[in-house]
Amino acid sequence: MGAQLSTLGHMVLFPVWFLYSLLMKLFQRSTPAITLESPDIKYPLRLIDREIISHDTRRFRFALPSPQHILGLPVGQHIYLSARIDGNLVVRPYTPISSDDDKGFVDLVIKVYFKDTHPKFPAGGKMSQYLESMQIGDTIEFRGPSGLLVYQGKGKFAIRPDKKSNPIIRTVKSVGMIAGGTGITPMLQVIRAIMKDPDDHTVCHLLFANQTEKDILLRPELEELRNKHSARFKLWYTLDRAPEAWDYGQGFVNEEMIRDHLPPPEEEPLVLMCGPPPMIQYACLPNLDHVGHPTERCFVF
């Protein structure tokens, strides 16, 4: 009798164990491994491809630990690259243009500041020139996620006033964005996250400032998104030095541009900014204030 009960117990337990094992394997397959497991750890990633986008802009692709890994970067956050250059530790923040929909790699689009091209900065950019000098197969250290803003979807943003504070949740129907130069990368990250979700009806208004037409980073990607999602993504450029045949704005970001190309204050939008500090301090913030956008609804990456 005891032997029969033992056999019966094994017969009952085996299907349960088998089903549990199968479910665990399916769960593991459906849950990709995360590269950035801790924001306090540096993860060396290997350069596997480099694409020349323009005379001074490159797309760098780095391999994640396995083809099944994702980076693990929430939308709105950035990473830090660190390298020892000329005996000194150099750390710089960057926002990837790839997302956690991409497995096995992370892409960075970076403008290379070459030496002897800008009179105020004759040495050029330390990190960007270091990246330019890297060979395929070389590694560089990534750390993150970092940042005070996370986009949670459906118009919901979690924003921390500082690193120690709890996030404040803001839900909006429209987002104003002002980007200058390489400041476009965090904007593109948020725009893509919104546009890929057909149930996210948040409308994005991007005002993108550059010096010349050839300086416009990621223009094909932006215009493809605009053409595909014209009801939800509004795009306007302004150039310091515009060509004669130019269909967009000219000059620095000003009050008129903000009135014409960002959502009005009455819609209670969130306004995101990223660009050179002088642009933010002297062009964006004062003119946003003149138009009526309150400080608490403005965020600078």
Swiss-Prot record:
The lineage of its organism: Eukaryota, Metazoa, Chordata, Craniata, Vertebrata. Changing residue 274 to A: Loss of 80% of NADH-cytochrome b5 reductase activity. The modification Phosphotyrosine is found at residue 43. Component of a complex composed of cytochrome b5, NADH-cytochrome b5 reductase (CYB5R3) and MTARC2. Interacts with MTLN; the interaction is required to maintain cellular lipid composition and leads to stimulation of mitochondrial respiratory complex I activity. This is NADH-cytochrome b5 reductase 3. Residues 40-152 form the FAD-binding FR-type domain. The modification N6-acetyllysine is found at residues 42, 120. Changing residue 149 to P: In METHB-CYB5R3. GO terms for cellular component: azurophil granule lumen; cytoplasm; cytosol; endoplasmic reticulum; endoplasmic reticulum membrane; extracellular region; hemoglobin complex; lipid droplet. Keywords: Acetylation, Cholesterol biosynthesis, Cholesterol metabolism, Cytoplasm, Disease variant, Endoplasmic reticulum, FAD, Flavoprotein, Lipid biosynthesis, Lipid metabolism, Lipoprotein, Membrane, Mitochondrion, Mitochondrion outer membrane, Myristate, NAD, Oxidoreductase, Phosphoprotein, Steroid biosynthesis, Steroid metabolism, Sterol biosynthesis, Sterol metabolism. Catalyzes the reduction of two molecules of cytochrome b5 using NADH as the electron donor. Changing residue 204 to Y: In METHB-CYB5R3; type 1; reduced protein stability; no effect on NADH-cytochrome b5 reductase activity. Gene3D superfamilies: Nucleotide-binding domain of ferredoxin-NADP reductase (FNR) module (3.40.50.80), Translation factors (2.40.30.10). Belongs to the flavoprotein pyridine nucleotide cytochrome reductase family.
